[in-house]
């Protein structure tokens, strides 16, 4: 622990809690909206394919219950990078989705500091790895037969929310 943290006098008990919050127009908010829009488009397309009875060339039918999406987006000056692992039978145009979100937010001119029509959009999305799929589809406890608790049966992959606190 740093000396700076040790020197903070405790208030209302002896812990320090911190969190991040960003304001309107922050690149993190734009990035989250792009990732959400990619997932929404994939789910909508997968449902459409499922209703049509689509079966992929590898013999796997479209099924919205089988969609897995770990989509992360980075937004910086003039550039959007969308990356991650996705399991779906659907194809969506990531570049079009990203530009549409940016346009809807209002970044449609270079004089605004970001232009939906001229920014670079890179899609680095690939198929979900078997290792990640294993952890998402079935929890470790399910795979080893060590639990029957319904909560413990749910797989989690590599996603999680962290909450950190410090106590004296």
Task: Give the ranges of each region predicted by the language model.
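Glycine-rich, N-terminal phosphate-binding loop and its surrounding beta-alpha-beta segment
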Residues: 48-51, 55-60, 64-138
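Short coil/turn connectors at secondary-structure junctions
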Residues: 13, 17, 76-79, 115-119, ...
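Hydrophobic alpha-helical hairpins/lids featuring a short glycine-rich hinge
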Residues: 126-161
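A short glycine/serine-rich beta->alpha loop
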Residues: 20-26, 86, 149-152
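Acidic, low-complexity proline/glycine-rich segments
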Residues: 4-7
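Conserved small/polar residues in nucleotide/adenosyl-binding loops
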Residues: 167-168
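N-terminal, positively charged regions that mediate nucleic acid binding
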Residues: 9-49, 54, 61-67
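Globin-like tetrapyrrole-binding proteins
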Residues: 164
């Amino acid at each position: 622990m740093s000396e700076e943290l040790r020197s903070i006098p405790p208030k209302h008990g002896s812990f320090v809690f911190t969190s991040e919050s960003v304001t309107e127009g922050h690149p993190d908010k734009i990035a989250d909206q792009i990732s959400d829009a990619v997932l929404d488009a994939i789910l909508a397309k997968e449902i459409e394919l499922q209703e049509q009875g689509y079966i992929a060339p590898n013999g796997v039918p479209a099924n919205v219950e089988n969609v897995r999406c770990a989509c992360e987006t980075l937004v910086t000056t003039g550039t959007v990078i969308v990356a991650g692992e996705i399991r779906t039978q659907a194809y969506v145009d990531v570049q079009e989705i990203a530009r549409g979100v940016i346009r809807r937010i209002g970044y449609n001119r270079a004089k605004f500091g970001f232009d939906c029509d001229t920014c670079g959009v890179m899609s680095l999305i690939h198929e979900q790895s078997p290792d990640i799929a294993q952890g998402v589809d079935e929890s470790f406890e399910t795979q080893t037969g060590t639990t029957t608790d319904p909560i413990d049966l749910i797989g989690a992959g590599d996603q999680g929310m962290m909450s950190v606190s410090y106590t004296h």
